[in-house]
C-alpha cells in the first residue's frame, strides 16, 4: 500500500510521514516527526521503522548510519513467526517499492503540469502588467491632452481679454478725439459769436460819463460820423443864465443818484441842428476827432472811471482797457465798455425811474423794471442819460 501524495509548486512531495525534496537528478526525504534528512527511500523507511516504530512488528533496532537492504528485511522476517511475521515482512518489502515507483512516476508528470501551470501564471501576470502599463500610458496621455486643452483655453481667454481691452481703448480714444473736436468747434463758434456781438454792439454800448460835455464842433463831427447815437438830454431844473463869453455852462445838481446834467444855450442847439443838416464828412476824420476829444476830456474823480494807465497794448498792436479795481483785471477793447463794467464795482445808481423811487446801475435793469412794474414800453432815449 502506498501513502497519499501532494505535489506542491516548490517541487516537493508531501506525505503523512515524509517530505520528498526533488533537486535536479537526486532527491532527499525529510521526516515530519524529527525533521531528519535521508538520502534514499530505503534509509527513510528504515528510519521510520526503527525510530518511530511505524511497522509495529519490527523489533530490531538499527542505527541511523546502518545500511538498510532487502536481505536484512528477509532475515528479520524468517526469524519471526510464520504467520504474522510473513505478512509484516511482505508489507515491509512491497510498500517501499510501490511507493518509490509511484512517487517517481507522479513526480515527473506532476512536475510538467506544475511547470505548465507556472508558465500560464507567469504569462497571465505579464499580460496583467502589460495591461496596467497601457492603462497608465493612456491616463498619462489623457492628462497631457487635458493640460494642453486647458492651456489653449487659457490662451484664448487671455487673447480675448486683450482684444476687449484694445477695443475699449480705441473707443475711449475716439470719444476723446470727438470731445476735443466738439470743444474746439464750440469754442470757435463762441469766439466768432463774441466777435460778431462786439462788432455789432460796439456802437450801442459806448457810454461816456454824463458829467463830460463836448464842444459843438466835436458833437457835430460825432453826429456826422454816425458811430455814436446822439440822444436828447434830460430837461434840468431852471438855472441862472450863463455869463457872457462862454460857449456853454455845465451845472451839477446834487440828487439822490448823483447825476450830472449839462445845459446848452439855444444858440448852441441851433448850431448843432445846422451842422446835422450839413454834408457828412468821412468816417475816418470823425473817428480821429472823437479820439482827440476823448484825450482832451478831464478825468472824472469817480472810482469807476478808467485811468490813463489802464490802457494796455497787446502783441498784435491792439489797445485794451484793463479794469484796475482791486483784483478784477478784466480787459475791454473799448473804454466805454470798461466803464460800463466798472459800475458793477461801485455803488452808483445812475438810472432812476421817473414813476417811482427805484434806481438801477444799468439801463437794461431800468427798462425791465418799467416793463414789469409800470407796463411801459418806451424808447431807450426816454430813460437813458446823456451818452456820446
From Swiss-Prot:
Instruction: Drop me one GO molecular function for this one.
Output: RNA polymerase II cis-regulatory region sequence-specific DNA binding
Location of this chain's protein in the cell: Nucleus
The entry's keywords: DNA-binding, Metal-binding, Nucleus, Repeat, Transcription, Transcription regulation, Zinc, Zinc-finger
User: An example Gene Ontology cellular component term from the record?
Assistant: nucleus
GO aspect biological process, one term: regulation of DNA-templated transcription
Zn finger intervals (C2H2-type): 29-52, 321-345, 351-374
In which residue ranges is the amino acid composition biased (Low complexity)?
Answer: 138-165, 249-265
Concerning InterPro entries, the annotation shows:
Zinc_finger (IPR050331), Znf_C2H2_sf (IPR036236), Znf_C2H2_type (IPR013087)
Q: Using the UniProt annotation, give all residue ranges assigned to the region (Disordered).
A: 138-168, 240-265
Q: What is its main location?
A: nucleus
Q: What does this protein do?
A: May be a transcription factor for genes having (A+T) stretches in their promoter and/or enhancer regions. Binds to AT rich DNA.
Q: Give the matching PANTHER family.
A: C2H2-TYPE DOMAIN-CONTAINING PROTEIN, PR DOMAIN ZINC FINGER PROTEIN
The protein here is known as AT-rich binding protein
Question: Which organism's genome codes for this protein?
Answer: Drosophila melanogaster
Amino acid at each position: 500500500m502506498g501513502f497519499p501524495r501532494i505535489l506542491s509548486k516548490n517541487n516537493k512531495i508531501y506525505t503523512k510521514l515524509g517530505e520528498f525534496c526533488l533537486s535536479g537528478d537526486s532527491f532527499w526525504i525529510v521526516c515530519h516527526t524529527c525533521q531528519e534528512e535521508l538520502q534514499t527511500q530505503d534509509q527513510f523507511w528504515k528510519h521510520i521503522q526503527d525510530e518511530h516504530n511505524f511497522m509495529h512488528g519490527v523489533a530490531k533496532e538499527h542505527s541511523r548510519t546502518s545500511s538498510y537492504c532487502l536481505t536484512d528485511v528477509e532475515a528479520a522476517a524468517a526469524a519471526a513467526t510464520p504467520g504474522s511475521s510473513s505478512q509484516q515482512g511482505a508489507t515491509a518489502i512491497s510498500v517501499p517499492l510501490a511507493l518509490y515507483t509511484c512517487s517517481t512516476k507522479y513526480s515527473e508528470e506532476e512536475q510538467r503540469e506544475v511547470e505548465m501551470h507556472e508558465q500560464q501564471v507567469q504569462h497571465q501576470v505579464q499580460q496583467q502588467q502589460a495591461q496596467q502599463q497601457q492603462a497608465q500610458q493612456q491616463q498619462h496621455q489623457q492628462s497631457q491632452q487635458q493640460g494642453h486643452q486647458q492651456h489653449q483655453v487659457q490662451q484664448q481667454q487671455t487673447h480675448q481679454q486683450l482684444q476687449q481691452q484694445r477695443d475699449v481703448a480705441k473707443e475711449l480714444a475716439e470719444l476723446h478725439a470727438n470731445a476735443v473736436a466738439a470743444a474746439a468747434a464750440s469754442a470757435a463758434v463762441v469766439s466768432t459769436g463774441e466777435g460778431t456781438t462786439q462788432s455789432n454792439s460796439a456802437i450801442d454800448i459806448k457810454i461816456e460819463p454824463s458829467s463830460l460835455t463836448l464842444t459843438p464842433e466835436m458833437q457835430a463831427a460825432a453826429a456826422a460820423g454816425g458811430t455814436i447815437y446822439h440822444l436828447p438830454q434830460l430837461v434840468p431844473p431852471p438855472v441862472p443864465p450863463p455869463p457872457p463869453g462862454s460857449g456853454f455852462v455845465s451845472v451839477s445838481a446834487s440828487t439822490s443818484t448823483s447825476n450830472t446834467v449839462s445845459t446848452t444855450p439855444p444858440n448852441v442847439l441851433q448850431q448843432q441842428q445846422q451842422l446835422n443838416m450839413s454834408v457828412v464828412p468821412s468816417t475816418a476824420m470823425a473817428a480821429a476827432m472823437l479820439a482827440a476829444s476823448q484825450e482832451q476830456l478831464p478825468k472824472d474823480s469817480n472810482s469807476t472811471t478808467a485811468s490813463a494807465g489802464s490802457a494796455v497794448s497787446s502783441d498784435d498792436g491792439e489797445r485794451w482797457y484793463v479794469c484796475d479795481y482791486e483784483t478784477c483785471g478784466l480787459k475791454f477793447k473799448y473804454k466805454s465798455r470798461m466803464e460800463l463794467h466798472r459800475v458793477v464795482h461801485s455803488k452808483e445808481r445812475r438810472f432812476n425811474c421817473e414813476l417811482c423811487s427805484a434806481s438801477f446801475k444799468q439801463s437794461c435793469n431800468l427798462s425791465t423794471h418799467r416793463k414789469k412794474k409800470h407796463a411801459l414800453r418806451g424808447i431807450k432815449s426816454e430813460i437813458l442819460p446823456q451818452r456820446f
